[in-house]
Amino acid sequence: MQDTRATESDVPEHRYNAALAGRIERRWQQRWLERGTFHAPNPTGPLAGPTATLPADKLFVQDMFPYPSGAGLHVGHPLGYIATDVFARYHRMRGRNVLHALGYDAFGLPAEQYAVQTGAHPRDTTESNIATMQRQLDRLGLGHDRRRSFATTDPEYYRWTQWIFLQIYNAWYDLELNRARPISELEEQFASGARPAPDGKDWASMSQAERAAVIDSYRLVYQTDSMVNWCPGLGTVLSNEEVTAEGRSERGNFPVFRKRLWQWMMRITAYADRLVDDLDLLDWPENVKAMQRNWIGRSRGAQVRFDSPAGQIEVFTTRPDTLFGATYVVLAPEHDLVDALAAAQWPADTDPRWTGGAATPAEAVAQYRKSIAAKSDLERQENKEKTGVFLGVHAVNPVNGARVPIFIADYVLSGYGTGAIMAVPGHDQRDWEFATAFGLPIVEVISGGDITAAAHTGEGELVNSDYLNGLSVEEAKATVIGRLEADGHGTGTIQYKLRDWLFARQRYWGEPFPIVYDEDGAPHALPESMLPVRLPELDDFAPVTFDPDDADSEPSPPLAKATDWVHVELDLGDGPKKYRRDTNVMPNWAGSSWYQLRYADPTNADAFCAKENEQYWLGPRTAEHGPDDPGGVDLYVGGVEHAVLHLLYARFWQKVLFDLGYVSSSEPYRRLFNQGYIQAFAYTDPRGAYVPAAEVVERDGAFFWTDATGTEIEVSQEYGKIGKSLKNAISPDEVCDQFGADTFRFYEMSMGPLDTSRPWSTKDVVGAHRFLQRVWRLVVDEETGASRVTEDAPTDETLRFLHRTIAGVDEDFAALRDNTAGAKLIELTNHLTKSYPSGTPRAAVEPLVLMLAPLAPHVAEELWERLGHSESLAHGPFPVADPAWLVEETVEYPIQVNGKVRSRIQVPADADNAAIEAAALADEKIAALLAGATPRKLIVVPGRLVNIVA
C-alpha cells in the first residue's frame, strides 16, 4: 500500500504552521519591546509622556499577582493573563491610554520552605523562578508595560511597604469623624486637654512611658498578647487562612495549636462598617461581596451582663428576646474569667456528665483546654459532638434572677463577640444539642415549634417570658433592650465576626518591621530616612522547628540569628543609643495590599505614588461611574480564592491611605472579575498513586498505563485541578512549540465563558490552529507567499455579515466574552473563504485582521504589515460597524395553523400586514393544509408570527 503521509517537502513553503508562527511571534515581540508599544504615559514623573497632553480616556487593567513557583506555569495559569491582555488590547485599539503591567508576589512561606529543602537562598530561588515565569509569559505576547514590573522582594518596593506600615502605625481612628488621623493630632488633643486623659489623670504629670502606653492603645497597629495558631512543625505562627478545617497547617499538614503570644496586630476592625457598607459602591460579583459580608459578620443585638462570683460576664446576643430561655452560660475555654471562676471543688450533686471525669473544676479546665488545643476555629464551630465542662459556679440571669450554671465549651470562640454566650437551647440548635448531651433544662420562649425534637429557630410569639409574652420577636427585642438599659444590665449594640489582623510571622523571607526597641523594651518607629530596613543575609535562614506535637514550644524567629543586624546603635533624634530590631517579618499579604498603587508610579524614588499619577489612574471618575464612585483599578481579574483575605486587606490599607490624604481613591478595585479554572483529567493506579496523564491510553471505555517494566496497568480517571503532583500538568511551552502562542491564546479564550471552569484537551487545540491557518490563507498564498487580497468591492451579503460581526465582536470584547467573539470571527472567516475562492476583498479582510488582533496579536500584526501598513495595529483603529448594514433586510415569520407551527416564510422587513398575509396564504405547505378553504381568522403579530385559525 502506498504511503500517503505528507513529507516535509509536501508542506507549502508559506503555510502558517508552528515553525512560521514561532518566527513571527519572536519578531513581533522584539519589535514591541524595542518600540515601547505598550508603554502607558503617566501625567508626571519619569514615565510621563513626550507631550503635555495626556488622553483623558484611560484604562487600568490589573491581574492578581502571580507567585513565582519553581515548577513554572501550566496551561491553567495564563487563562486570566490572556483574558486581561485581550481586554487591554481591545481598549488600546479604541484609543484609550491603557495601563497593564505584571509584577511578582515573591515573599512568603512557600519560597522559604522551597529554599530550605533545596539548600539555596530564597532570594536566588525566587529570582530564578521569576526569570522562568517571565520567559514563559513573554512567549505568550502579553502586552505589558515592562517598565512597571517589580517584585515584592525588591528593596525599592518593600521600602514603601514598610513606609505604609509606619503610616498606619502612626495613625488612630477617630470615631467621631469616622476616619483615621495622624497620631500626632491625638497627642495634641491630650496635651491641650481637648481629650481627657484616662482615669482622670493629668496628661502633663504622666511619665513618658505612661503617655506612650496610652497613645499605643489607640494606634491602628499595636502589640498585644493574643491567641494565635502556633505550628511547632513549621516553627511559625499561621494566620487562620493557613490552617485547615482539621486544625493542621495547609503547608506540610502539621498540627496547629492555639496559644497566647505577644504579636503585632492591625486594627482592621475600626473599618468594619465602612468595609461592609462600601461594598455597595463596587462592581464586584455578588458572591464575593457576600463572602466579605459574612467574614466581617456584622450583627445587631445586645450586650448583656450576667452577675457571677468573679464579676460580671458580658455576653453578646443577636436574640435578646430569648433571654428568659437562657438556662446556662458558656465561656470560650480561653476566656479571661475562666481561671477565676473555676471553683475549688465540685458542688454537691454535680451531674457526672458535667465534670469530664476530673477531680476538681480546675483540673477539668486544664484537661479540656489541652484536649482542644489542636482544633482550628472552623473545626470547633463545625464539630458535631458537643463537649465541655462545668466550672462549678453559677451566674444570674438578669431578667428573671434565675441561677444558671457556667460551662466552658469549644463551640464558643474567644475571638468572636465577648467570648461568652447565654445558651438558649429551646431556640438555638447548637445550644439544644449541648443541653441534650448534658441534661440541661430546655425552655420554650418562642411559640410554634416542638422543642422536644429540635430547637425552634423560626418566628412566633413570646411565651414563658413575663412582660414579653404575646409580643413578636422584633417587638420583644426592642422591649427587652430598653429594660436592660434602664436596669443597667445591658445595652443595644453591634458586633462583628471580624478580628484584628495578626500581622507578624516568625519567618525569614518577608518584609522586616521598621521598628526597634530601646533597652526598656519600648518600641520606636524608624524615620523614613532609614528605610528600607533590608533583610540581612543569612546562611541559616530556616526557622527553628520543634516536635510537631510540642504545643508548649515557643517561636524562635530566624532573624534572631543575625545578631549583628538585630543589635544596633542608632540616632533617632536624641543621640546615639542601643536598640534591638524586631525579629518578626510581615505576612505574605503585605506586599499585595498596595501593589496597584505602585504600578501607577513604579520608578518614583520620592513617594510610593505621586498624587497626580494616582489621581489619573485610580481616582474617582464621577462623570463616568456616578457620584458615589470610590475610584480604584478599572478591572481586576483573578481567582475567587482571594475573595476575602487579600481583597479585604487591600481595601483596609487603601482606606487608611485615603483617610490620611495620600490617595484620592477610597477603594483599590472598582471592578472585580473572577475567572474560572482550566481543569484536566488525572489518573491513579490501583495503589492510588498518580501516573503521567500524557502516557495514558483509552481503550473500550477503560484507561491504561504502561509502567517502567512494560506492564500495562488499568488506571482510574478523575477530573479536577491541574498540577505537578497530579502528573497532569501541561506546560504552555509544549503547546506553543507544537502550534504557536497565538493558537494557544485563541484556544484558551474559546474554551468557554471566562467565569466558568473548563476542561483542557490538547487534541482540541488543533481546531484553533486550523482557524488561524484559514485566516492566513485569506491574505497569503501558501505556495508563493504573495498576497491574495483584491481591491474588489465586497458583496452586500458580505458587508452585512461583516458589520454584524464587527458589532457583535465589539460588544463581546467589552464584556469579556472572548469565546463568543472568537466564534463570530470563525464564522466570518468561513464566509470569506467560501465566498471568495480567488481572492478576498481588502475591505472585508482588513477588519477581520483588526478584530483578530486582541486574541492572536502576532499573526494579526504580520498580516496587517503584509496588507501594506507600516504602523503597528496595537493602537488601532478597531473597526466600527456601519449601522446601515445592521438593519435586517428580511424577517422570518413562523406560521401557526390552529396553534401548531406548520411553515415559515421570509418577507421584506418593511412589509405591511397585507403583504405578510398574502405571503402566508401563498406558502405551499399552508395552501395544501387549507385545501382552498378560507381561514376563519388570520392574525399577524408584527415581527413575530402569523396565526391562522382554519
UniProtKB/Swiss-Prot annotation:
**Motif, 'HIGH' region: chain positions:** 66-77
Give me the residues that bind ATP, please: K724
Record has RNA-binding as a keyword: no
Extract one GO cellular component term from the record.
cytosol
Q: What is its EC number?
A: 6.1.1.4
Q: Where in the cell is it found?
A: Cytoplasm
What Gene3D superfamilies does this protein's entry cite?
A: HUPs, Isoleucyl-tRNA Synthetase, Domain 1, Valyl/Leucyl/Isoleucyl-tRNA synthetase, editing domain
Its EC top class is ligase
Q: Does the keyword Ribosomal protein apply?
A: no
One MF annotation (Gene Ontology) recorded for this entry: ATP binding
> Keyword annotations for this protein?
Aminoacyl-tRNA synthetase, ATP-binding, Cytoplasm, Ligase, Nucleotide-binding, Protein biosynthesis
The main location class comes to: cytoplasm
Pfam families, A to Z = Anticodon_1 (PF08264), tRNA-synt_1_2 (PF13603), tRNA-synt_1g (PF09334)
GO annotations under biological process? leucyl-tRNA aminoacylation
- Motif location ('KMSKS' region)? 721-725
User: Reaction catalysed by this chain?
Assistant: tRNA(Leu) + L-leucine + ATP = L-leucyl-tRNA(Leu) + AMP + diphosphate
Which family is annotated?
Answer: Belongs to the class-I aminoacyl-tRNA synthetase family.
Q: What is this protein called?
A: Leucine--tRNA ligase
What organism does the UniProt record list as the source? Nocardia farcinica (strain IFM 10152)
Which gene produces this protein?
leuS
